[in-house]
């Protein structure tokens, strides 16, 4: 009986340690706001070029999107 109590206690302790390692700090990601680029001209073919123009406008990045392929700048709200 004493052996089984020790075994159950050890198994429960290992289980709690295993669960606790998966419960690290939770990070919350900021929302991303988008705004149409004012300086990008023409259809947006390269997301890299769009991101460079948006960096010059003071944004964090940019991407091409939409049917008409426009450049939209992105930043954290």
UniProtKB/Swiss-Prot annotation:
<keyword id="KW-0929">Antimicrobial</keyword>
<dbReference type="InterPro" id="IPR036574">
    <property type="entry name" value="Scorpion_toxin-like_sf"/>
</dbReference>
<dbReference type="GO" id="GO:0005739">
    <property type="term" value="C:mitochondrion"/>
</dbReference>
<feature type="signal peptide">
    <location>
        <begin position="1"/>
        <end position="30"/>
    </location>
</feature>
<dbReference type="InterPro" id="IPR003614">
    <property type="entry name" value="Scorpion_toxin-like"/>
</dbReference>
<dbReference type="GO" id="GO:0031640">
    <property type="term" value="P:killing of cells of another organism"/>
</dbReference>
<dbReference type="GO" id="GO:0050832">
    <property type="term" value="P:defense response to fungus"/>
</dbReference>
<dbReference type="InterPro" id="IPR008176">
    <property type="entry name" value="Defensin_plant"/>
</dbReference>
<feature type="disulfide bond">
    <location>
        <begin position="54"/>
        <end position="73"/>
    </location>
</feature>
<dbReference type="GO" id="GO:0005576">
    <property type="term" value="C:extracellular region"/>
</dbReference>
<keyword id="KW-0295">Fungicide</keyword>
<feature type="disulfide bond">
    <location>
        <begin position="44"/>
        <end position="64"/>
    </location>
</feature>
<keyword id="KW-1015">Disulfide bond</keyword>
<comment type="function">
    <text>Confers broad-spectrum resistance to pathogens.</text>
</comment>
<comment type="similarity">
    <text>Belongs to the DEFL family.</text>
</comment>
<dbReference type="GO" id="GO:0006952">
    <property type="term" value="P:defense response"/>
</dbReference>
<dbReference type="GO" id="GO:0009506">
    <property type="term" value="C:plasmodesma"/>
</dbReference>
<dbReference type="Pfam" id="PF00304">
    <property type="entry name" value="Gamma-thionin"/>
</dbReference>
<feature type="disulfide bond">
    <location>
        <begin position="33"/>
        <end position="77"/>
    </location>
</feature>
<feature type="disulfide bond">
    <location>
        <begin position="50"/>
        <end position="71"/>
    </location>
</feature>
<protein>
    <recommendedName>
        <fullName>Defensin-like protein 1</fullName>
    </recommendedName>
</protein>
<keyword id="KW-0611">Plant defense</keyword>
<keyword id="KW-0732">Signal</keyword>
<keyword id="KW-0964">Secreted</keyword>
